[in-house]
Regions:
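Conserved catalytic loops of ABC-family nucleotide-binding domains
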Residues: 89-108
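ABC ATPase nucleotide-binding domain "signature" region
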Residues: 49-50, 56-61, 85
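A short, proline-enriched helix->beta-strand linker immediately N-terminal to the Walker B motif
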Residues: 63-67
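ABC ATPase nucleotide-binding domain "signature motif"
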Residues: 35, 39, 43-55, 80
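ABC ATPase nucleotide-binding domain helical subdomain, centered on the C-loop/LSGGQ "ABC signature"
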Residues: 3-43, 87-88
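Walker B catalytic motif
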Residues: 44, 73-74, 78-82, 86
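H-loop (His-switch) and adjacent beta-strand-loop-beta switch element
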Residues: 103-121
Length: 121
């Protein structure tokens, strides 16, 4: 289910799950499913697009409130607008130390970073 894919059977409230789904811009999509959080996923995510699967994995990480995250191409399967919204939501957490690895970092996001290292070949 959506719930299990996020919680991996750990104890999180529905409110925590919905909050993290909103953070990754997946809340409306899950609300549209027949059983919401308890919608059963089949065949490697079945009805979810590649970008939705990527956001589900991101929700699984974010709900655990780790103090340090390393995200490698975490929004690569998303359109630019959605990627920026999610990255802004993640960067809004001032308690989080975040290392982002990306081939395409938007200027709006880059301006919010404490430091940005660009590797050029």
């Amino acid at each position: 289910s959506i719930r299990y894919n996020i919680t991996l059977d750990e104890d999180f409230s529905d409110e925590e799950i919905w909050n993290v789904l909103k953070k990754v811009c997946l809340d409306e999509r899950v609300k549209s499913l027949d059983n919401g959080l308890d919608h059963e996923l089949e065949n490697m995510g079945g009805i979810l697009s590649g970008g939705e699967k990527q956001r589900l994995v991101l929700a699984r990480v974010l709900i655990r409130d780790y103090p340090i995250l390393i995200l490698d191409e975490a929004t690569s399967a998303l359109d630019e607008k959605t990627a920026i919204r999610i990255e802004n939501n993640i960067l809004a957490d001032n308690q989080l130390t975040l290392i982002m690895i990306s081939h395409h970092i938007q200027e709006e996001i880059k301006q919010q970073l404490t430091e940005c290292v660009e590797l050029k070949v």
